[in-house]
Amino acid sequence: MPTQIRFGKGRINELKEIIPSYGKKCLIVSRPFNGSLKKLYEKINKILEDIGVSTFVYDGIVPNPTIDGVNEGVKIASENNIDFVLGVGGGSVMDSAKLIAFLKNKDSKINWNEVTKKYNNPFKISEKPKDAVPFIAISTTSGSGSHCTQAAVVSDLEKKEKITVFHSGLFPSVAIVDPELMLTVPSKVSSATGFDVFAHAFESYLGNLTSPLTEKMSFEAINLVFEYLPKVINDPENINYRSKMAWADTLAGMCLSNGGADLPHPLGEIIGGICPRISHGETLAIVYPEFLNYKENISPQKFSLIEKETGLEKIGQSLTLKINTLLKEINLYDSFNYSNISSNEIKLISNHPLLDILQPENSSEIKNIMNNSLK
């Protein structure tokens, strides 16, 4: 992984040492700067100002970010001849900022059909666009792992679908992971992003691209989530708990970048594409109970090994029960009942063409997972 990760309490203060190598014109990408984010922005802006860096701000990022938002960011970056992009926020901001830096071009226009066809393989080696600029990530949540992956996901609202772009150029040049920036994240957001951490570690292990290194990282991340995510929800300002989840997120992100995800991610993206109001973590929670019932029967050895590595075997608890218990502890188990998905949306989700091409193709099991999750 080409990203330099600066992890730990207070590492945000190292920004003044990092920035000078990347130029004099910076585009800061974020959600609207209010509340605790406003103080962080003021701190970052002061650091940049003190070292003579001109800043431009695009704070129009929304949850489940859109191609329209990326288009606007690319326009700002291109018209102002930005030297580098600084993303400040969670997964939605990271993915948007990555794409803005990667797709910056002199014409300020993006052909999304071309982008999705050209950059659709996480492990393909190819040149990045000639006008791309470096991206620096400052994480404010523990969830997406986007600060250490080569992927970015955005929504096409017109087509009601999510687009995933892959390229090694989407790895940040530097990622600052400072748990102090995460102390004010609301519990609902911590639940959704925290479960995404688990999903990355778990699903990357279930695939066929694991290695001894990624297996160890998966097991460590899973153990950390099992122990510390419920604690974070109950005691959100505990810096130790936040640090543990931030480290789990980083480990799981590295696992994801090497091993990829399993069925819940594309299934969740189908739901999120049609219902962009539902967070990514919540869409995963919707499909997970049914996915577990399916997966434990076809991957019993992997489930057994996780049970051994997490101590579940010793207490006679199944992995499926433990994951469902975790979902209950973080108030995500009944996500479908709280998501207000309409009957028309259920129909669109159930008939989505992607369900026919996910592996194994035309599998009734995949459709059953989705349909049973929407009851």
What is the predicted role of each segment?
Residues 1-84, 336:
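ATP/NTP phosphate-donor binding region
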